[in-house]
Protein backbone atom coordinates (compact mmCIF):
# COMPACT_ATOMS: atom_id res chain seq x y z
CA UNK A 1 0.00 0.00 0.00
CA UNK A 2 2.74 2.45 0.97
CA UNK A 3 4.71 1.60 -2.18
CA UNK A 4 1.59 2.48 -4.19
CA UNK A 5 1.29 5.85 -2.45
CA UNK A 6 4.95 6.63 -3.18
CA UNK A 7 4.48 5.77 -6.86
CA UNK A 8 1.36 7.94 -7.01
CA UNK A 9 3.27 10.90 -5.56
CA UNK A 10 6.02 10.54 -8.17
CA UNK A 11 3.40 10.23 -10.92
CA UNK A 12 1.66 13.45 -9.81
CA UNK A 13 4.98 15.32 -9.77
CA UNK A 14 5.86 14.06 -13.25
CA UNK A 15 2.48 14.84 -14.80
CA UNK A 16 2.53 18.31 -13.22
CA UNK A 17 5.87 18.93 -14.92
CA UNK A 18 4.35 17.74 -18.19
CA UNK A 19 1.60 20.34 -17.83
CA UNK A 20 4.17 23.09 -17.57
CA UNK A 21 5.98 21.74 -20.61
CA UNK A 22 2.86 22.67 -22.56
CA UNK A 23 3.68 26.35 -22.11
CA UNK A 24 6.43 28.95 -22.19
CA UNK A 25 10.05 28.02 -21.71
CA UNK A 26 11.45 30.41 -19.08
CA UNK A 27 14.16 32.83 -20.23
CA UNK A 28 16.00 34.57 -17.41
CA UNK A 29 17.48 38.05 -17.60
CA UNK A 30 20.64 37.89 -15.48
CA UNK A 31 22.49 41.06 -16.47
CA UNK A 32 21.21 44.57 -17.11
CA UNK A 33 19.28 45.03 -20.36
CA UNK A 34 18.59 48.76 -20.16
CA UNK A 35 19.77 49.86 -23.62
CA UNK A 36 20.14 48.54 -27.16
CA UNK A 37 23.76 47.47 -26.62
CA UNK A 38 22.87 45.28 -23.62
CA UNK A 39 19.60 43.89 -25.00
CA UNK A 40 18.79 40.38 -23.78
CA UNK A 41 19.10 37.95 -26.68
CA UNK A 42 16.17 35.67 -27.43
CA UNK A 43 17.83 32.52 -28.89
CA UNK A 44 15.02 31.63 -31.30
CA UNK A 45 11.99 33.89 -31.61
CA UNK A 46 9.85 31.01 -32.88
CA UNK A 47 10.26 29.01 -29.65
CA UNK A 48 7.71 29.82 -26.94
CA UNK A 49 9.66 31.81 -24.33
CA UNK A 50 8.39 33.46 -21.15
CA UNK A 51 10.33 36.38 -19.63
CA UNK A 52 9.31 37.52 -16.13
CA UNK A 53 10.39 41.06 -15.29
CA UNK A 54 9.46 44.24 -13.41
CA UNK A 55 9.48 47.88 -14.49
CA UNK A 56 10.38 50.28 -11.69
CA UNK A 57 9.23 53.62 -13.02
CA UNK A 58 8.71 55.56 -16.23
CA UNK A 59 12.45 55.76 -16.93
CA UNK A 60 12.95 52.00 -16.66
CA UNK A 61 13.14 50.46 -20.15
CA UNK A 62 13.87 46.80 -20.99
CA UNK A 63 15.42 45.71 -24.29
CA UNK A 64 15.35 42.31 -26.00
CA UNK A 65 16.70 41.28 -29.40
CA UNK A 66 16.44 38.40 -31.84
CA UNK A 67 17.61 37.52 -35.31
CA UNK A 68 15.05 36.69 -38.00
CA UNK A 69 14.79 35.84 -41.67
CA UNK A 70 12.58 37.56 -44.18
CA UNK A 71 9.09 36.05 -44.05
CA UNK A 72 9.39 34.76 -40.47
CA UNK A 73 6.32 35.02 -38.24
CA UNK A 74 6.59 37.02 -35.02
CA UNK A 75 4.35 36.55 -32.01
CA UNK A 76 4.78 38.51 -28.77
CA UNK A 77 2.41 39.26 -25.91
CA UNK A 78 2.41 41.20 -22.67
CA UNK A 79 0.67 39.68 -19.63
CA UNK A 80 0.42 40.96 -16.08
CA UNK A 81 0.42 38.75 -12.96
CA UNK A 82 -3.01 38.83 -11.38
CA UNK A 83 -2.12 40.79 -8.27
CA UNK A 84 -4.48 43.60 -7.32
CA UNK A 85 -1.73 46.21 -7.07
CA UNK A 86 -0.89 45.66 -10.77
CA UNK A 87 -4.48 45.66 -12.03
CA UNK A 88 -4.09 48.97 -13.92
CA UNK A 89 -0.54 48.34 -15.17
CA UNK A 90 -0.46 48.61 -18.97
CA UNK A 91 3.14 48.69 -20.28
CA UNK A 92 3.86 49.39 -23.93
CA UNK A 93 5.56 46.98 -26.32
CA UNK A 94 7.72 48.32 -29.17
CA UNK A 95 9.37 46.62 -32.12
CA UNK A 96 12.44 48.39 -33.51
CA UNK A 97 14.14 47.54 -36.81
CA UNK A 98 15.29 49.07 -40.06
CA UNK A 99 12.12 48.77 -42.13
CA UNK A 100 9.20 47.63 -39.99
CA UNK A 101 5.94 49.56 -40.22
CA UNK A 102 2.51 49.56 -38.64
CA UNK A 103 1.15 48.01 -41.83
CA UNK A 104 2.99 44.78 -41.00
CA UNK A 105 0.93 44.23 -37.84
CA UNK A 106 -2.13 42.04 -37.38
CA UNK A 107 -4.79 42.74 -34.75
CA UNK A 108 -6.76 45.70 -33.51
CA UNK A 109 -4.63 47.19 -30.76
CA UNK A 110 -3.55 50.82 -30.58
CA UNK A 111 -0.40 51.32 -32.68
CA UNK A 112 2.00 54.24 -32.87
CA UNK A 113 4.75 54.53 -35.48
CA UNK A 114 7.99 56.50 -35.08
CA UNK A 115 10.96 57.43 -37.25
CA UNK A 116 14.40 57.86 -35.69
CA UNK A 117 14.22 61.65 -35.53
CA UNK A 118 10.78 62.14 -33.95
CA UNK A 119 8.69 60.76 -31.14
CA UNK A 120 7.95 60.96 -27.42
CA UNK A 121 9.52 57.62 -26.54
CA UNK A 122 11.65 57.10 -23.39
CA UNK A 123 14.51 55.88 -25.61
CA UNK A 124 16.32 57.15 -28.70
CA UNK A 125 15.71 55.17 -31.87
CA UNK A 126 19.03 54.25 -33.52
CA UNK A 127 19.73 56.02 -36.84
CA UNK A 128 18.25 54.23 -39.81
CA UNK A 129 15.69 52.39 -37.70
CA UNK A 130 11.99 52.78 -37.03
CA UNK A 131 9.75 51.78 -34.13
CA UNK A 132 6.17 50.62 -33.89
CA UNK A 133 4.59 50.73 -30.45
CA UNK A 134 1.62 48.57 -29.51
CA UNK A 135 -0.43 49.70 -26.51
CA UNK A 136 -3.25 47.97 -24.69
CA UNK A 137 -6.49 49.92 -25.03
CA UNK A 138 -9.02 47.31 -23.92
CA UNK A 139 -11.09 46.93 -20.75
CA UNK A 140 -9.60 46.79 -17.25
CA UNK A 141 -9.58 44.16 -15.86
CA UNK A 142 -8.66 42.41 -19.08
CA UNK A 143 -9.27 38.75 -19.93
CA UNK A 144 -7.53 36.22 -17.72
CA UNK A 145 -5.30 33.24 -18.39
CA UNK A 146 -4.86 30.46 -15.80
CA UNK A 147 -1.65 28.44 -15.70
CA UNK A 148 -2.44 25.06 -14.05
CA UNK A 149 1.06 23.91 -13.11
CA UNK A 150 1.87 26.93 -10.94
CA UNK A 151 -1.78 27.67 -10.09
CA UNK A 152 -1.29 31.28 -11.14
CA UNK A 153 -3.43 33.67 -13.19
CA UNK A 154 -2.50 36.49 -15.55
CA UNK A 155 -4.27 39.46 -17.06
CA UNK A 156 -3.69 39.36 -20.80
CA UNK A 157 -2.74 42.66 -22.40
CA UNK A 158 -1.70 43.43 -25.99
CA UNK A 159 -0.38 41.05 -28.63
CA UNK A 160 2.08 41.84 -31.40
CA UNK A 161 1.62 39.60 -34.43
CA UNK A 162 3.45 39.94 -37.73
CA UNK A 163 2.81 37.08 -40.13
CA UNK A 164 5.77 37.96 -42.35
CA UNK A 165 8.73 40.01 -41.14
CA UNK A 166 9.87 42.35 -43.91
CA UNK A 167 13.59 41.56 -43.98
CA UNK A 168 16.45 39.50 -42.57
CA UNK A 169 18.28 41.08 -39.66
CA UNK A 170 18.19 41.95 -35.97
CA UNK A 171 14.94 43.06 -34.38
CA UNK A 172 14.48 44.64 -30.95
CA UNK A 173 11.53 44.30 -28.59
CA UNK A 174 11.32 47.12 -26.04
CA UNK A 175 9.08 47.15 -22.96
CA UNK A 176 8.40 50.42 -21.15
CA UNK A 177 5.60 52.33 -19.47
CA UNK A 178 4.58 55.97 -19.59
CA UNK A 179 1.12 55.48 -18.11
CA UNK A 180 -0.27 58.29 -15.99
CA UNK A 181 -2.18 55.72 -13.94
CA UNK A 182 0.59 53.29 -12.95
CA UNK A 183 4.20 53.29 -14.15
CA UNK A 184 5.55 50.46 -11.97
CA UNK A 185 4.65 46.81 -12.13
CA UNK A 186 5.51 43.27 -13.12
CA UNK A 187 4.98 41.82 -16.57
CA UNK A 188 5.51 38.65 -18.56
CA UNK A 189 6.78 38.96 -22.11
CA UNK A 190 5.83 35.88 -24.13
CA UNK A 191 7.62 35.42 -27.45
CA UNK A 192 7.11 32.62 -29.95
CA UNK A 193 4.57 29.85 -30.33
CA UNK A 194 6.47 26.55 -30.66
CA UNK A 195 6.63 24.54 -27.42
CA UNK A 196 10.08 23.02 -27.13
CA UNK A 197 10.92 21.02 -23.99
CA UNK A 198 13.39 18.15 -23.77
CA UNK A 199 13.38 15.33 -21.21
CA UNK A 200 16.32 17.00 -19.47
CA UNK A 201 14.27 20.17 -19.06
CA UNK A 202 11.88 18.30 -16.75
CA UNK A 203 14.69 18.08 -14.19
CA UNK A 204 16.89 21.13 -14.91
CA UNK A 205 14.50 23.91 -15.96
CA UNK A 206 10.95 23.17 -14.82
CA UNK A 207 11.50 22.77 -11.02
CA UNK A 208 13.37 26.09 -10.57
CA UNK A 209 10.94 27.76 -12.99
CA UNK A 210 8.04 26.75 -10.74
CA UNK A 211 9.85 28.25 -7.75
CA UNK A 212 10.74 31.46 -9.61
CA UNK A 213 7.14 31.89 -10.74
CA UNK A 214 5.85 31.58 -7.18
CA UNK A 215 8.29 34.26 -6.03
CA UNK A 216 7.30 36.40 -9.03
CA UNK A 217 3.71 36.23 -7.75
CA UNK A 218 4.94 37.01 -4.23
CA UNK A 219 3.71 33.64 -3.00
CA UNK A 220 6.17 32.50 -0.34
CA UNK A 221 3.91 29.91 1.32
CA UNK A 222 3.70 27.40 -1.55
CA UNK A 223 7.50 27.10 -1.98
CA UNK A 224 7.87 26.52 1.76
CA UNK A 225 5.31 23.70 1.64
CA UNK A 226 6.86 22.22 -1.51
CA UNK A 227 10.38 22.24 -0.08
CA UNK A 228 9.09 20.68 3.13
CA UNK A 229 7.42 17.90 1.12
CA UNK A 230 10.61 17.30 -0.85
CA UNK A 231 12.38 16.73 2.46
CA UNK A 232 9.64 14.87 4.34
CA UNK A 233 8.39 12.49 1.62
CA UNK A 234 11.81 10.97 0.74
CA UNK A 235 12.58 10.71 4.46
CA UNK A 236 9.36 8.80 5.12
CA UNK A 237 10.02 6.49 2.18
CA UNK A 238 13.56 5.84 3.45
CA UNK A 239 12.32 5.11 6.97
CA UNK A 240 9.66 2.75 5.60
CA UNK A 241 12.19 0.85 3.47
CA UNK A 242 14.66 0.56 6.34
CA UNK A 243 11.97 -0.78 8.68
CA UNK A 244 10.77 -3.24 6.06
CA UNK A 245 14.28 -4.55 5.43
CA UNK A 246 14.82 -4.82 9.18
CA UNK A 247 11.63 -6.88 9.60
CA UNK A 248 12.68 -9.19 6.78
CA UNK A 249 16.09 -9.68 8.37
CA UNK A 250 14.55 -10.40 11.78
CA UNK A 251 12.07 -12.84 10.22
CA UNK A 252 14.86 -14.76 8.52
CA UNK A 253 16.83 -14.83 11.78
CA UNK A 254 13.90 -16.17 13.82
CA UNK A 255 12.73 -18.64 11.17
CA UNK A 256 15.79 -19.95 9.34
CA UNK A 257 15.22 -22.49 6.59
PLM ranges: what are they?
Residues 1-21, 228-236:
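Secretory targeting signatures
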Residues 20, 113, 117, 131, ...:
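Positively charged, low-complexity intrinsically disordered regions
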Residues 22-50:
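N-terminal leader/pro-regions and domain N-caps
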Residues 25-35, 64, 85, 90-103, ...:
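C-terminal edge strands of extracellular/lumenal beta-sandwich accessory domains
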Residues 42-73, 78-82, 92-94:
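Non-catalytic, beta-strand-enriched accessory regions in extracellular/secretory proteins
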Residues 100-139:
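Extracellular/luminal beta-rich ligand-recognition
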Amino acid sequence: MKETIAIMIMFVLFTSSFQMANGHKPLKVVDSNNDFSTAKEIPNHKISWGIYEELRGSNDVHYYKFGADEGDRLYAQISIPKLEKFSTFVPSLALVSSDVSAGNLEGGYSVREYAHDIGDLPFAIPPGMRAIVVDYNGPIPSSEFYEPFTQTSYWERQEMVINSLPSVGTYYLVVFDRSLVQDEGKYTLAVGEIEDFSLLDFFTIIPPAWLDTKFFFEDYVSPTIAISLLVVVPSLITIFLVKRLKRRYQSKTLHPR
